[in-house]
Amino acid sequence: MALDNDFSGKVALVTGGSRGLGRAMALALAQRGADLVITSRKIDSCESVALEIEAIGRRALPYGCHVGKWDEIEGLVNAAYDRYGKIDILINNAGMSPLYDKLSNVTEELFDKVVGVNLKGPFRLMSLVGERMVEGDGGSIINISSTASLNPSPEAEPYGAAKSGLNALTRSFAFALGPKVRVNAIAAGPFLTDISKAWDMEAFEKRAQSTLALGRGGQPEEIVGAALYLAGPGGSFTTGTVIRVDGGTR
């Protein structure tokens, strides 16, 4: 079996694909021959990434979508299949982890938003796309989880709980959609993306020396290797699992 990560003829849908980890994975797939559906709430940002992909010589469909809203998800899936006729790779990357000062100040609205984007949306996307993958030639689904799902902290309780649920969905969908569809998750550690610009970087870098084996945060491109492995033929016997890409987070 060839393990060269050639994705020519494949179609990938990446949520949260307009920046950060999503953009890095989308561009990497395009560079290896895949056509893309790029979606996030900000259509302008999706269009910018689509232009980058088209400059590589691949096709791209930018689509504005709030993945916490099922009616918008259904529109996204229909648009993707209308354009390409299939989806081979689904990457549930969109997420949100808003800050709060104490647990009692987490509102019902905030809690529901976190669960909607990190858990409810991926469930619906996996249901809709996975069913079509089973009816077609199969595929690979990759859920971007978080080390917060494995080592939850008081600063990210709703987020950690939602991502823990995503890990559970990863396992159950692997059985529900197998053997034609593989479903895996990547537990991402602290990556330096647009979101990290709000961090106290001096405090983070100091803390990283004792909490991360590599002593630093990750660059978006450093998640690409794991994503390509899970999406491609190299991961053909890997399903229902969570792979940590976290710099050795304690």
Language-model segments: residues:
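Conserved glycine-rich cofactor-binding loop
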Residues: 11, 18-20
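Short C-terminal tail/terminal secondary-structure segment
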Residues: 2-4, 97-100, 151, 210, ...
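Substrate-binding pocket helix/loop in short-chain dehydrogenase/reductase
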Residues: 101-103, 107-112, 196, 208
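Active-site helix of classical SDR
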Residues: 126, 162, 170
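C-terminal substrate-recognition "lid" of short-chain dehydrogenase/reductases
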Residues: 84, 123, 217-245
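Alpha-helical segment proximal to the catalytic Tyr-Lys
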Residues: 131, 174-179, 236
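Residue(s) in the substrate-gating loop at a strand-loop-helix junction
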Residues: 146
